[in-house]
């Protein structure tokens, strides 16, 4: 069928006084619904009226006439050029548009391009632009131009001087139509002419007929593309619009290109769109689930840079290979754990080694402070803490978080790995993000709900360079670390099974600890202490978010590594002298160590842990006074505590500081039955407490410690209990008691969910933990009374005395 054909239907008076007309087809687009009205020109009562001209499209048609069997002339399109089309139509000048019955009957009989049932069920274009083809849009042609008024006279249109297009196909098609009309006239009697003309022939448009407004350029061989379109339309499967509307431009870009690349090229593996990431995204432009060959922890921005010819670009396969290595090893050896802190450029060796290769061994025993003092592995800036799996600076932490949460898709304009440093880290975000992933930052550590507090319990995944480790470790320590790595490499798998804890089989790290829980003793990390910490650490994915946020600020409770280094420095200086000298010289060296350590001297503690001051109460007050400053800093960083007013914060601290101190001492003493561990390694037994009048208080603390040991309280339950004790809303001095109670209920719900999830065999554990709070409060009441009596005539301990005076 040709692209555009139109036949002039001219009514003439018949032999019976009626009117007879010739109806020839007008091409209608298959996607256009024929919801229009059509009037038959052969009605008996019709009268010939004035002729009207309706300007429909921007095409001029010149008409030829072909003879018909009864002697009438049928006008036929001879050629057309770009201009205006004038189609004379019959009808009355005051034609009414409400002839509904006759028009509906005409539509029922003629069946003019009605949509089939399959077409009604098929998809429809979202906008008018979806109806157009790429050629029409790109060519910039004006496709529809309608005149607002109907003229009453025939106005000849002047066509612009443009070449005539596609003359022969249109004339050939119209000659075929004329021949078909002759066959129909011969086959059917005159009485049934109207009926068969309505059912067999396609009529020309009258005044109420719909006119096709869509122009499609003519193609050779009678436009096979139109036939294919008609075939697909009849089948009920309409193709998607080739040019979607502008409001869906973002959707079209992401549905025809990978999320990790520019919409102009295709670099990535096939993917499956999904809404698992964020259902609130209006455009769904970044909701993708990749095929199984990609790890869920990989960046959505991979394979951006084309590798040079003849070379293997490591930024693509190195990350995937590393993930496969980690996934294949279920129980890492201690040698592998000793290499788990990697920060140097030697990690790029993963790009050129096989799957079975391992990292070069690096010495173990690195403290948190040594890691913080090292440069950022991504840009070389100063490290601010443990962020998303590695120690990094604040700038790279924020960049990684914004990139993942905002789903940024960066592309390197240089096409290769760019240098990332402090001065150039903002020039190429694509290479910077790839380096973040290579150094060990984890996508799953970013919170999708954008709440504060990341999942910082992920273990480090990079190794420290030997150049940085050599000045930090002594030769003996370096030799010991090398020996430990050699022994670990020869260790059999069945000998390493005891390194798995009882909470889901998580490997216990032997070289590093969680950043949120540094060593309580403050010395170098030991394997025994780290084993205990590993038993208490659980999988982060099953920990409630509130408990994880509380755990993230737990390190503020402890002394900093700088303070611990000041304490341990004199101990190492006088250790050799005290071992070779007599007891008197050892005593003098211990006294000298006490004098040279401000913290030990203020706390009244000696290097060997014995009480250097006979007044134990004064020592404990000094320790408590120093610890209270840490408690205040810890409270101000808690997620729930920050939402409370300043006056209520002070009131809560005054009422709970003693409970917090004693509860931390009891939890610290779980592994030492019969004695209470104080701060900085100080231990008090029941016999020592009797001689100082603290028997009742220490006895109650030992009883509470036994209950904690029996319940197997871990670190998450410990930090949750501290927050619950802090947010006690039963005091009358609170201004917003309801708000404090709501915060405490949130902590209670998180603790209950945690205990039920991790200890399903002991459902009563949550209730038993809460029963320990009244015992703790009674013990603290006794301790406060003793401190008030003992320190009435003693020295002033600043914050401790201020808190004691605030309660009385």
Swiss-Prot record:
Main location: nucleus
Pfam families with a match to the protein in the record: Hormone_recep, zf-C4
Signal peptide segment: none
GO MF term list: nuclear receptor activity; RNA polymerase II cis-regulatory region sequence-specific DNA binding; zinc ion binding
Positions with biased composition (Low complexity): 280-289
Keyword entries, A-Z: Activator, DNA-binding, Metal-binding, Nucleus, Phosphoprotein, Receptor, Transcription, Transcription regulation, Zinc, Zinc-finger
Location of region: Disordered: 1-20, 114-133, 209-289, 325-366, 516-540
Function as written in the Swiss-Prot or TrEMBL entry: Acts as a cofactor to fushi tarazu (ftz). Facilitates the binding of ftz to DNA. Binds the sequence element 5'-YCYYGGYCR-3' in the zebra element of ftz. Probably also functions as a receptor for a yet unknown ligand.
Subunit structure: Monomer; forms a complex with ftz.
Protein name, as recorded: Nuclear hormone receptor FTZ-F1 beta
Organism of this sequence: Drosophila melanogaster
Gene name as annotated: Hr39
